[in-house]
């Protein structure tokens, strides 16, 4: 800063945590078994998206005989070959950009592709194409909530392409997982809260028909299918004593409704 060297550090454990250690819902973990499609993990910077994805990729590595390619900036967790073969590439070191790396990856017959972040139109468009052509693609966005995530993707495209993109998303999207890390009640760390949207026929229909405003209520009524809203998850954490009332309200999407349910 101002002529002096500066650095930003993030502590990353070298051991990849298991999904149950992170509290990742089982319905989310099982998405690694999909043969094709797009799975998005969303949330603000520092919400644990990379760790969640590393844990799911590790689960796939342990259980599938697949070819997995990860494109990251930077590489945070090292995946060793287990049942699968895992190739990891770092933007800036091994490739110029996510879009370049993704195009190259498609020529290598991968089963699963992790794209560290969908930053621009070219990367998003190529990721959608990859999911359409028989690959399972995992990626992240800095959005909160399924509806805003879908809107964000569609808004990146020129107006004349948006309806076609909406139809493509309705076909290929398998899940949107939004997460936040909330300080625990005992002050000894943070606990993850998740919103889970899975691509049921009802959800696919809402995306296709441009009724994103109805997605939240559909998630609320689909808990038996493994879906849950972020606020319902936060409320469960509060009721189980994992987080304080104040923290529940700070992270709630709808504070008025949260207070009533408390």
Set out the residue ranges of the language-model regions.
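Short, flexible helix-loop junctions that flank or precede catalytic/ligand sites
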Residues: 1-262
């Amino acid at each position: 800063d101002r002529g002096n060297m500066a650095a930003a550090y993030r502590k990353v454990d070298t051991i990849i945590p298991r999904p149950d250690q992170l509290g990742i819902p089982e319905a989310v973990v099982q998405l690694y078994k999909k043969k094709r499609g797009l799975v998005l993990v969303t949330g603000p910077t520092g919400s644990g998206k990379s760790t969640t994805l590393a844990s799911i990729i590790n689960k796939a590595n342990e259980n599938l005989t697949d070819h997995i390619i990860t494109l990251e900036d930077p590489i945070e967790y090292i995946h060793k070959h287990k049942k699968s073969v895992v190739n990891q590439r770092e933007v800036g070191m091994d490739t110029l950009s996510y879009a370049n790396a993704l195009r190259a990856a498609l020529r290598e017959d991968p089963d699963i592709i992790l794209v560290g972040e969908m930053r621009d139109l070219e990367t998003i468009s190529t990721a959608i194409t990859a999911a359409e052509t028989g690959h399972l693609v995992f990626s992240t966005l800095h959005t909160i909530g399924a509806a805003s995530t879908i809107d964000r993707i569609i808004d990146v495209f020129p107006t004349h392409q948006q309806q076609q993109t909406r139809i493509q998303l309705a076909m290929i999207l398998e899940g949107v997982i939004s997460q936040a890390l909330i300080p625990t009640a005992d002050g000894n760390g943070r606990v993850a809260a998740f919103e889970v949207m899975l691509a049921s026929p009802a959800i696919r229909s809402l995306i296709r028909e441009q009724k994103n405003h109805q997605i939240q209520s559909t998630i609320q009524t689909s808990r038996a299918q493994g879906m849950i809203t972020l606020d319902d998850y936060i409320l469960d954490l509060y009721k189980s004593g994992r987080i304080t009332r104040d923290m529940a309200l700070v992270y709630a999407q709808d504070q008025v409704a949260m207070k009533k349910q408390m």
